[in-house]
Every structure is written in C-alpha cells, then in structure tokens.
C-alpha cells in the first residue's frame, strides 16, 4: 500500500465490504425463498429506520477505519480514553482528510503533519462511540422481538469485539493479532 493513494486503498476496502453486504443480502433472500421458510420477521417502522441508520454509521466507521489504516495513523493516539494526554489533542483536519494525496504527503506536497494523523485517528475513535451507542440501541430493540434475539446477541458480540480489539490496538501498541481481528 505504500505506493497507492490512501483514497484508492480505502475505496477498495469499501468495495469489498459492499460486495460482502450484497452477497449476504442474496444469501438471506435465498434462505427466505426456500420451502418451509418462516418468512421475514416484521419489524416496527422505527426499528427499520434505526437499522438503516446504524448500517450507514457502520459504513462510515469502516471508511474511517480504512482511512486510519491506509494513513498509518493508528499510533497517533497511544493512550485511552484520552489522546496524547488530552481530551481534545492538537489536530489538523484539513490535511488529515484531504482525500486525493499521496501516502504520507499533504495535498501541498509537504510531509503530512502529525496533527493530521491525530485528527484521522481521533475522528475514528469518537465516531466509534456514536456507532457503539447506535448498535446497542438497535440490539435492545431487536431483543424485544423474540425472532430477532439471536441477531441482537450477534450485534452486541460484534460491537464488543470491535471495541475490545480497537482498544487493544491503542494500549498495546498495535499487536498484530488485535490489528487483524479489528480489521476483519
């Protein structure tokens, strides 16, 4: 990835995730078309809207995580819950989120400032709080539908897995097992 633009690598990740989502959607449609299938579970309109919103939030979070990874910004914050000992560290959003640039370079051609890496990492971290809250709320609503309790358990388990592996990456200086687990 050293020779590729971070935007290209991140878009490649999102393309792979879109393919995975489409394959899963096709799998569910196939399962529901089987004879003897109980059919789809009806969800309240509010739960369906929240499901779509959480899907969108997760999609943005995956993009932000890809941006952290492709910019090698994971070690910009090496403490938790603060970053560099601050609740709001020095950040450079303009350079950190300039999409079309070479790896490690600002769009001006200069080296990417450390504050840009901090901005990339910290935005991913803060958005994780929003995503985690949305997933917890959705899991609670799904738990109230007996046919969706298994899905609710999976949702909680995956959210906790992402939180744990993300935290492990920060406090243990990016061990390979945690990095791979958080990515996949």
Spell out what each predicted region is.
Residues 1-184:
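Polytopic transmembrane helical bundles with strong interfacial aromatic enrichment
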């Amino acid at each position: 990835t050293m020779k590729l633009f971070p935007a290209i690598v991140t878009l490649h990740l999102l393309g792979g995730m879109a393919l995975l989502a489409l394959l899963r959607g096709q799998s569910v449609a196939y399962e529901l078309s089987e004879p003897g299938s109980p059919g789809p579970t009806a969800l309240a309109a509010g739960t369906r809207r929240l499901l779509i919103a959480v899907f969108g939030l997760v999609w943005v979070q995956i993009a932000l995580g890809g941006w952290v990874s492709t910019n090698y910004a994971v070690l910009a914050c090496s403490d938790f819950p603060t970053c560099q000992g601050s609740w709001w560290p020095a950040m450079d959003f303009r350079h950190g989120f300039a999409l079309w640039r070479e790896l490690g370079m600002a769009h001006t051609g200069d080296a990417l400032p450390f504050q840009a890496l901090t901005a990339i990492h910290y935005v991913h971290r803060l958005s994780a709080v929003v995503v985690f809250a949305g997933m917890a709320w959705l899991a609670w609503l799904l738990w109230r539908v007996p046919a969706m309790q298994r899905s609710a358990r999976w949702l909680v388990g995956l959210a906790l897995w992402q939180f744990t592996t993300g935290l492990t990456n920060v406090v243990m200086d990016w061990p390979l097992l945690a990095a791979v687990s958080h990515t996949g």
